[in-house]
Every structure is written in structure tokens, then in C-alpha cells.
Amino acid sequence: MQTITIHGRRTLHGSIRPAAAKNSTLPLLAATLLCDGPCRLRDVPRLADVDTSLALLDAVGARVRRCGADLCTRPADRLCGDIPEHLAGAMRSSVFYLAPLLCRVGYVRLPLPGGCRLGPRPVDIHLAGLAAMGAEVELEGIAVTLRRTGPLHGVDFTLRLPSVGATMTLLMAACCAAGQTVLRGAAQEPEIGDMIAFLSASGADIQGAGTPVLTVQSGRPLGGAFHRPLPDRIAAATYAAALACAGGQIEIAGCDPASYDSFLRFLAGTGVQVSRVGDCVRLARDPAVPLRGGAHLRADAWPAFATDTAPLAAAVLLTAAGESEIYDSLFANRFACAAGFAAMGAACTVRGRQLTLPGGAVLHGTDVTAPDLRGGAALLAAALAADGETRLRDPGHIPRGYEDLPGALRGLGAEIS
């Protein structure tokens, strides 16, 4: 079993620049299937989920290759609508291939997608929207099959929840549907804006970016585009959480502070010094001065506190003075990392979707297991504040979303092997 070893109580110093966002890159790779011309995604990080996406694209017949740090695609001669089960089960983002393959092939079969075990993550909004556009939907045990007998058609559709994944799926489908599509109650996360930017650069006519109502006027094929995915705001928040846990002074460059503003405001409330200059954030903390607790956070859809940063906030609050609570309204099992926190000496409790942190914990190194992607990153951050050596076992989730997170933190002064 792979293990990451962290020696705590080392302050962080230096500058770091987040790579392209995982949550943008993965759906953009699926969207390249819609294009009649070549596409190039620039500066794509080497993540496990990116490698899985490349294998999936190859399996369905797409033409994709690495061009240095970029990913280059060309229109395929022929695509297949059957997504292999082992690839679908390896990542949640396999759901993004529903719309492109349905549009291109007329048929797609997707085994239930995998990823982190965060509780129920239904695809019903994706399927309801595609059905409204004319897709025939068949659920068969562990797989879903979609067919169309003619072109998809535009629709006025209201999402029952502002799902990021469903919004992206329906945007892609709308670009191929005949006529006008209006999506109401759409997600507004920055990654939605990035998808719209890519599709628009490829020739799509999309209005309403940054609002909950998106209008897509179809009618012309997508030609393809060269596009740089936006920087990873969750990685930026992870580096910021690491600084808050370890102390020191760092600069996070090249990632719009507005994209992770809720997390920066949270850190400022705990006593971390936060300053913003253009696309740079400077953070400083004296590890001899206790952080302030008493936080009451609710993770929800944008622009609320981001669900992916909830475990990171928990790591910061473990040692802070005062009881704090974090509630995640999106994922039922978001706080699986609490078992690791408890093993390190924090008397935290989970009831339903709420994590309660008494604060003031004195953390000590021990063996902990990474339960999921963000929970694993949170345990790594917490270990930076612990006395002694922490061994993070089974950290395989972490490379799915971070390009060498241990190496990035080592570059800032952490002692990690």
C-alpha cells in the first residue's frame, strides 16, 4: 500500500502557481468530441483522472495525444457509443460523455460512473434534460443507455438543482440540438463559464454566462478551439489551507482570488493574514498565535462556500480556539476524513451532513487513511500542524485531482516523502 509520510511543524515559504482546474479540464476533454475541427487544451496537468479520460477517449475512437504540456484532439473517423465499465467506474466525470456521444453516434451506454464515495450523486437531472431534448433513456441495472432516432431539439428546461455536471451536460447537448435551448436554474460556478468560453470559441452561440439562465441558439457546427482551462481554485484553496495549518508566508499566483473568495474570507476570519494583488494572493500566519474558531460554514452551490473546500476548512479549524460547525448541503458523506482527524487527536463528531469541531486540538502524528480526494488533501494539511510523523495511507485518490501535491508542498518547505 502506498504511503505519504509527513513531518509536521515545518512552516511554509515561497510562491506557487496552481495548474489548470481538474473540474474544468475533464468536461472540456469530453466536449472536444463535439467539434469538427482540431482542439488544443493548453497546460493540462498530469492527473490520474486526465489519464483515465484519455483512455476513455481512445476507447470510443477519438484521436487525442499529448503535445508537451498540451492535449491535442482531431475529429475521429468513427466513434463508438459503448463506454468501457472499468473506465466509467474509475471516475465520476465519465458522465460528461453522455451528451457528446449521443449527439455524435446517436447511441451511448454508460455504466454507473465512479469517483469519490461522497454519497448519492444521481444523474437524474442529466437524463431528464436529455430526455426533454428527445433522447430515449433506458436504465438497466448498473448502466444507462440513451438513443436518438433523429436530431435532438431545443427545449426550455428547468434544473431541479443547480448541478454543475448537469449544466455542462445540457450545454453540450444544446449545442447540437435543433433550435433554441433555455436552461433555467443553471449552475454558475467558474467552471461553467470556462465551458461556455470553450464552446463559444468553437462557434457556439451561448448567452447568459454567469447567470442562472443560459440560452443556446444552435444551428452551426462547432469547429474546435485552442483553449487554456482556468486555474484550479480548489488547488489554490488547498495551498492556502496548508499555510493556515503550518504557518509561514506564501504567495499563490495566477489564480483569480474571486474564484475562491469564500475560502479566503474564511481564512481571514481565523486570523490568517490575507492580501490580494491582481491575480496573486499573499498569506501569512505566525504558528505561535492560535487561530480563531467559532466558524459556522455551510457548503452549497456557487457563490456559497465551495463543497470541495469544506474538508480543508475542517483541517484548519481543528486547532483553532472555539467550537466550529460545517454543514455540507450537497454531499452526504463529505466528512469521511473525520475518522482521520480523530485519530490525530481531534474530538470532532459527524451527525448527518454536519461536522462539529470543538477546536483547540493538539494534533499528533499517526497512521491515517485517505477516504477520498479532498478528504485526503485535508488530512495531509492537518498533518502539517501535527507533532511528529503522520503516515497517510492509500493516498491514491489525491493524484486524481492534484498534480504532485506532496511535491508542491515540499517546494514550499514541507517535509514530505
Model segments located where?
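Short, structured segments at the rim of ligand-binding sites
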Residues: 1-417
